[in-house]
Amino acid sequence: MTETPRRRVPDSPPGRRAVLKLTVGVALTLPVAHFVNAQDDNRRKARPQTNDRLVFAGGDRKGQLITLADLPAGGPPLTAYPMEPTANVVRDDSRLNQILLVRLDPNRLNGDTRARAADGIVAYSAVCTHTGCDVWDWQPASGTIKCPCHFSEFDLKESARVLNGPAPRRLPALPLKVVDGAPTVAGGFVGRPGFETGGG
């Protein structure tokens, strides 16, 4: 008995069922990927939340965790963004999340400021309440900070109250606590960050 040699059948194109399975698989994964990206976008835009860590907003250490050692007594202030601690998502998709951090003498802080401070470190919105400029002109002798655009001056020892200039209200404060040697958000902004529309 002689065997006839087997001939290889050429590959055939995928059948309808295989194409349908592939299409359904792709269709099911796309919304999940979009949902995950949308969640990250929402977390990046969200205002600071309790237990957020604080990271450098720029410079050589951008995105790195800020520790107590990074904040010497008397300043200078650091600009930070909050970072969601479980997924390490930096909330940097809104300028209104920029935070000023500075360590002051706790004995010079008023009661409200001291209650929101951690180890003398105070945190405020870094966005002026007048027209939304970045506030950064530090005055170490007085413990104040000025907006370079229209010269509003805020007293960081007294809940960032307005001392001079056209800003209509104080900089919103951000309560802090210390966790594992790092300043950490203890609650949401006290006041709305940003400026009032129509401010001149």
Name every feature range the model reports, one short phrase each.
Residues 154-195:
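Short Fe-S-cluster ligation motifs
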Residues 38-127, 131-137, 178-200:
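N-terminal pre-ligand scaffold of iron-sulfur
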Residues 4-27:
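N-terminal secretory signal peptides and thylakoid transit peptides that target proteins
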Residues 129-136, 140-170:
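Acidic, glycine-rich flexible loop segments
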